[in-house]
Amino acid sequence: MIYKLTPALRDDLKTPFGTLYPGKGESCLAKVVKALDKPPKIISIGDVTTFYLIKAGVVPDMCLVDDQTMRLPVDHEVRKGTSHHTFKELRVSNPAGVVTQALMDLIKDNMSSTEPVRIFVDGEEDLAVIPACLYAPIGSAVIYGQPNEGVVVVRVTEEKRKETKALLDKMERVDE
């Protein structure tokens, strides 16, 4: 099953899904790190967000990257900086504008990993926020970049899971 983003939903997703921390780079992620308060899991989505999170001394329990930012290749420093010697490295295909069943399964199956997981996405990882919020333990933090605004932290609650499931239900379903 592939879940495809509809034009109406694309507009809805421009609104941050959690708490927006305005700014960019190290200063923005420093505010995020200070506010984290030891969640059960930290999941970062996006190369630049993951890079600055690791640079701030926080290795996420799971990160999803695609070697791009705003549809352009990231520089060598960011690409290298999203790697960490403790990561279990995985790979999945997920085209832009969709959430594939393979992406959902990989996130779900590895959420309980005791070692940090880095998932390289062939395609686009932006919508991985949806399965991350569905499968992360309650209290976890899902962190992603909001283009030209800052970084968003989604605290996983039962209510947030219901919102996430509702988003997934609004997406167009296509057989693979």
Curated annotation (Swiss-Prot):
It comes from the Archaea. It holds the Pfam family DUF359. Keywords: Coenzyme A biosynthesis, GTP-binding, Kinase, Nucleotide-binding, Transferase. One of its GO terms (molecular function) is kinase activity. The keyword Nucleotide-binding applies. The keyword Kinase applies. Pathway: Cofactor biosynthesis; coenzyme A biosynthesis. GTP binds at D47, V48, D66, E125. It is an enzyme of class 2 (transferase). InterPro entries: GTP-dep_dephospho-CoA_kin. It catalyses: 3'-dephospho-CoA + GTP = GDP + CoA + H(+). GO terms for biological process: coenzyme A biosynthetic process. Its EC number is 2.7.1.237. PANTHER family: GTP-DEPENDENT DEPHOSPHO-COA KINASE, UPF0218 PROTEIN TK1697. Catalyzes the GTP-dependent phosphorylation of the 3'-hydroxyl group of dephosphocoenzyme A to form coenzyme A (CoA). Belongs to the GTP-dependent DPCK family. This is GTP-dependent dephospho-CoA kinase. The lineage of its organism: Archaea, Methanobacteriati, Methanobacteriota, Stenosarchaea group, Methanomicrobia.
